[in-house]
Amino acid sequence: MTDSKPNFQKAYINANEILVSSKIITNFPYSATKLIKEQSSIVCRSFDKAHKYNVDIEAFGSDSAVIMNLDDKYIIFYNQNEMPERIKFSMLHEFGHKVNNHKFIVTSDEVYGIAEVETNYFAAQLLMPEQILREFQKRGRRIDKYFLMTIFGVSEQAAIKRIENLNQITWERSQ
């Protein structure tokens, strides 16, 4: 990743390709673990199981989740003590690093920040697809954080951020 800003279009397209190809996603919310398993060879394990792989999770600086390449096998380790909604987002975020072809050895804070924003957008699109939200709006539904939390099974933080991003997207597309 050498771009100077997040490639939202790439993240959007990659998420949409998964949304339309998945047989797991028949309604919302869905199982992130099952989706990752269906779409890749990535294995998901809790932080509690990291020691079985001789992995020190604390060395990676994430309290929620991390993706690692161990002997050419990708594993997403997640914090089982988080809320289920947070775990789901974190797992799909880490999955997004692989899908969006991010480097796992980051050369700078700027590159890391760009990758993080891009994968947050990817995870949000998988969990709360823009197309579905726009259709709800066309049908008169008010899209607020409570609606997103209830229908899509996401955390309050993810719902608020998605609404902010959707408002930004609407403004940018009208330019």
Which sequence ranges carry the predicted segments?
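Active-site hotspot residues in diverse enzymes, especially metal/ion-binding acidic/histidine motifs
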Residues: 1-175
